[in-house]
Structure formats: structure tokens, C-alpha cells
């Protein structure tokens, strides 16, 4: 209802994705009565910004453009719903340094400064996914929420210059995911790699990932996926 005390998460996310796609959504059902107590939830979104994201999807844009739009819509949606969240980007060139782009901390409000950081992201280097997950998990583990979701957005397999491709990268990433779970975190991977089903079950388990086969759909689907993952939380 339009004058409710709390925004309806599912309704708002659908409204926001429709608006992003140029469809005029119905704002009349966005609100609902606030449940007793706020959601005790924290989410950290970790985005792969490696050079492979410079690949063109079609004549309308590149993978990095879909990632940028996803971060914009994700940020707008979660800021409106009131859930606590942070956003990081990462890429790598061998073990050190792993480049970490601080897009939004948990303490920062979502606004013009954060939008500017999202706009400024650029692809570069490689995907040392295990290191990225460990860094993000360390930050998320500091949060005191009862549910802590680590949402990982990537476009392909772990890879780097120092033989990190293949079994080494896969096993390092699997160990990083296990370490995160032992800290009480909930890692979940969102990939646009059409071959993701070949290796992601080994890394995240059968229910720990989703493959989005059309990269252009990523901005609209990511907030809705978040709503499903956090339903009731």
C-alpha cells in the first residue's frame, strides 16, 4: 500500500527493474506494514572487474557495462529497502597485488559519491577469485548480522598469470568458499559464463550458484535473485 510503514522488498525490486528497462511500473503496491524488528541481514556484493569483462555482448554494450548497470540497480534497490550492504570490485595480477576497488562500505550511505565510483569502474588484469573471496569474506565477517550473504558476480573461471588457471585456481577458490562458510557467511555465485555448470557445483555446491545465460539480463535479474535469496531473512 502506498502509505505503509516499510517498503515491500519484492514489489520494489520488480518496480525498479521495470523502471530500469523503461517500463512504467505500478508504485501503488510498494509498501507494507513493517514486520516486528528490522531484517538482521548484511550483504556484500563482490564484482569481478577483470579484463575479460571488456568483451562485447552485442552491438549495444560490453560485459562491464552490464556489470555497471547491475551495481547501479542493486545499489538503488537495496538503499530503498533499507538492507545493509557493501560493494567491492576486484581483479588481480599474480598473487600480489590483488586490486580491490572499494565501491561502497557498510557505513557509507548510497548516493552520488557511490554512483560516481560505479561509473568509474574499468576492466583490467585477471581473476584470482580465491583471493577476492577471502578479502570480501574478511570484511563481511566483521558485521554482526545474523545472516551475512556474500554475493559474487563473475564472468568466468578463476585465472591469473602464474598458472592460477585450471586445477590450482579451481581448488584455491573452493577452499576460499569453504573458509567463508566456516566463518558463518553464505557465499553465492552469479555468473554469465555459459560453461559455469561444468565447474561451479565443485566450487559452491549445486545450490550455491546461478548461471545467467544472457548477460544483458543481468541488471534486471540480480536484484530479483537477491530478493529470493533473502526471503524471510
Spans of model-derived segments:
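Flexible, glycine/threonine-enriched loop-and-boundary segments that flank and lead into catalytic domains
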Residues: 10-33, 71, 121-122, 132-137, ...
Amino acid at each position: 500500500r502506498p502509505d505503509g510503514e516499510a517498503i515491500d522488498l519484492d514489489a520494489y525490486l520488480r518496480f525498479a527493474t521495470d523502471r530500469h528497462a523503461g517500463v512504467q511500473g505500478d508504485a501503488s503496491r510498494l509498501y507494507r506494514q513493517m514486520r516486528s524488528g528490522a531484517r538482521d541481514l548484511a550483504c556484500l556484493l563482490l564484482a569481478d572487474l577483470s579484463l575479460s569483462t571488456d568483451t562485447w555482448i552485442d552491438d549495444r554494450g560490453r560485459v562491464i557495462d552490464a556489470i555497471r548497470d547491475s551495481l547501479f540497480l542493486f545499489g538503488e534497490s537495496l538503499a530503498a529497502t533499507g538492507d545493509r550492504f557493501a560493494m567491492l570490485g576486484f581483479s588481480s595480477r599474480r598473487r600480489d597485488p590483488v586490486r580491490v576497488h572499494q565501491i561502497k562500505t557498510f557505513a557509507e550511505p548510497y548516493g552520488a559519491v557511490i554512483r560516481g565510483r560505479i561509473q568509474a569502474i574499468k576492466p583490467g588484469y585477471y581473476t584470482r577469485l580465491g583471493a577476492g573471496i577471502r578479502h570480501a569474506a574478511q570484511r563481511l565477517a566483521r558485521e554482526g548480522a545474523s545472516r551475512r550473504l556474500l554475493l559474487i558476480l563473475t564472468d568466468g573461471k578463476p585465472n591469473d598469470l602464474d598458472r592460477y588457471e585450471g586445477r590450482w585456481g579451481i581448488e584455491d577458490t573452493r577452499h576460499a568458499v569453504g573458509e567463508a562458510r566456516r566463518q558463518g557467511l553464505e557465499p553465492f555465485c552469479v555468473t554469465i559464463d555459459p560453461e559455469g555448470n561444468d565447474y561451479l557445483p565443485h566450487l559452491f555446491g549445486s545450490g550455491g550458484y546461478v548461471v545467467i545465460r544472457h548477460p544483458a539480463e543481468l541488471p534486471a535479474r540480480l536484484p530479483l535473485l537477491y530478493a529470493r535469496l533473502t526471503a524471510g531473512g
